[in-house]
Each structure stands twice: as C-alpha cells, then as structure tokens.
Amino acid sequence: MKKMQEPIEDPLSKLTQYSGKTFVIKYGGSIMKNKKAEEAFIKDVKYLRKLGINIVIVHGGGPEISRWLELSGIESRFVDGLRVTDEKVIEIVQMVLSGKINKKLSLQFNIDGVNAVGLSGVDNKLIEATKKYVYKGNETIDIGYVGKVTKVNSEFIKELLKGGQVPVIAPIGCDNKGNVYNINADYAAAFISSALDAEKLIILTDVEGVYRNINDPQSIIHEIDIKDVNYYIKEEIIKGGMIPKVQCCASAIENGTKNVQLIDGRNDHCLINDILNYRGTIISYRSGVKCQKAI
C-alpha cells in the first residue's frame, strides 16, 4: 500500500509560472485501479486548471482491455510489449478505451467541476496513424491493427484548450482508408505533446521513476539528459518495459516538448506534489534542474 500524501500548502508561487502553458498527461490503465489516487488526480487537474494551465490527458486501459478479452474468451497476446490486435480485438479495444474508460473519466472530471470533453483519436481525425510492424532480425511480424502515429490534429486540440476544455483522449488512431488502430498510450501522448510544443509531458507510472537498481528504492535517477538515454540502455540501467517508455519521452523532447517527468501515479496528489518537488525522473535537454529525493 502506497503512503498517501497531503497536497503541499501554498504551491501557488511555484505553479503560477506555468499559467498559459500546456501539460500533456499520460494516465495509465494500471493507475486507474486505485480509486483514491484517481480522485486526487482529478482534484489536482482541477487545481492546475484554476491556475490557467492547459491540460491534455491521454489515457491507457491495458488491464481493462485484458479483462474484457478474457470475458470474451480471447487470449491476450503481446509482441515486444505491443498487444496483438486482430479484428475481434480491435473491436473490444475501441469499446473499452473509447466507450467505457474515456467516457467514465471525462464524466468524473465534469462532475468535479472540470470542463472536460472525451475524445477518441478518430474524432475529427485527431490521431492519424499507419500500420505498425515489429522487426526481429530479418523477420517482419504482423501484429494486426496496431498503429504508429503519423499526424495529430493539433489545431483542433488548441481550439478546445482556448475554449477552456480539458481534452481526454483515447489512443485510437485512423487512416484515410477507414482503418482503425490500437496505439500505445505513451507514444500517443508523446506525439501529441510534441505537436503542441507542450511545456511538460507527464507520464504517470506504477513506479517512482527510473532506477539504477530496481531493487534499491534509493537508486532512483532524478534527471536524465536525453543525450545519455542510449548509454543507460546499453548499460542495461534502463531495460525491459522502461526502454520504449524512455525512448518515446526522449523523442517528445527532440520534437518540441520542453521536458518530461515520469512520476508514480499511485501516490495521492502526485500531480501537484511531484511537480513541485521534482520527484520521479525528469528527462530533458539540460542538466540544470535541481531535483530532490522522493520523501
């Protein structure tokens, strides 16, 4: 059980510097299972909006997709962390992400006084995509209706932000032929963040950040310059499922995002507390941000 935290008192002086800026937040499916953390997250977003910070949310939903596939008698299969998505699976993916999670989350925001609009990437061609393949040596693996983002309708998002809305986006993409694709939420959030030249991309995870040694809580790396990402991967400091996550964060910075922060979404009021205290792992071009150890 993660220790719950109270929001830091009077954070206004630190957060007002971001007024008028845009934060893109990736809200993971594994975090949604923590009801108290979800409630605190919604309140944090409400507070940031009151300060004039533009918020865009891209949500996942992997655990819920797996649950509905199991209920439908369909086995969940993955290749390099990507869900194999055939015609039956993509129907369930759309149902869960666009019809269930997206609408529930946007409804919760509106109930709590946040003007939010739930969207799928197919709405107004918000997320355009093309079919993604996995390559292993000389082998090309077809994983079905899994897509990679090619274009984001950033003007549409900006208009929503100007209208005071919080776009809540399900990572479903489409192409000009009418195909619909399942897109990794980390990659969708990174692409959207770059398209908006966002001040921050915040990735909510189920760990405190990137560790030198996953078994040592004190070994968290508080800041990574993107020029060091490949070194950390080569040395297997960054490994497993954290590799694509950090790579897409680095790509976001290379394409316009100011910095990326990976924080533990299980902590109560993580969005406020961790931004203020530079907790988690910050990925950026520079090495000038003073980071504190998580407490």
UniProtKB/Swiss-Prot annotation:
Residues involved in substrate binding? 61-62, 83, 182
Task: Report if keyword Transferase is assigned.
Answer: yes
BP-aspect Gene Ontology terms: arginine biosynthetic process via ornithine; L-arginine biosynthetic process
Picking any one GO molecular function of the record gives: ATP binding
GO CC field: cytoplasm
Provide the alphabetized UniProt keywords. Answer: Amino-acid biosynthesis, Arginine biosynthesis, ATP-binding, Cytoplasm, Kinase, Nucleotide-binding, Transferase
Compartments where found: Cytoplasm
The protein's annotated catalytic reaction(s) are:
N-acetyl-L-glutamate + ATP = N-acetyl-L-glutamyl 5-phosphate + ADP
- So what EC number does this one have? 2.7.2.8
**Site, as annotated: Transition state stabilizer:** 26, 245
Check the record and name the InterPro entries matching this protein.
AceGlu_kinase-like_sf, AcgluKinase_fam, ArgB, Asp/Glu/Uridylate_kinase, Glu/AcGlu_kinase, NAGK-C
**Pathway(s) annotated for this protein in UniProt:** Amino-acid biosynthesis; L-arginine biosynthesis; N(2)-acetyl-L-ornithine from L-glutamate: step 2/4
Pfam families hit by this protein? AA_kinase
CDD domains of this UniProt entry?
Answer: AAK_NAGK-C (cd04250)
Q: Which family does it belong to?
A: Belongs to the acetylglutamate kinase family. ArgB subfamily.
Q: What does this protein do?
A: Catalyzes the ATP-dependent phosphorylation of N-acetyl-L-glutamate.
Name it: Acetylglutamate kinase
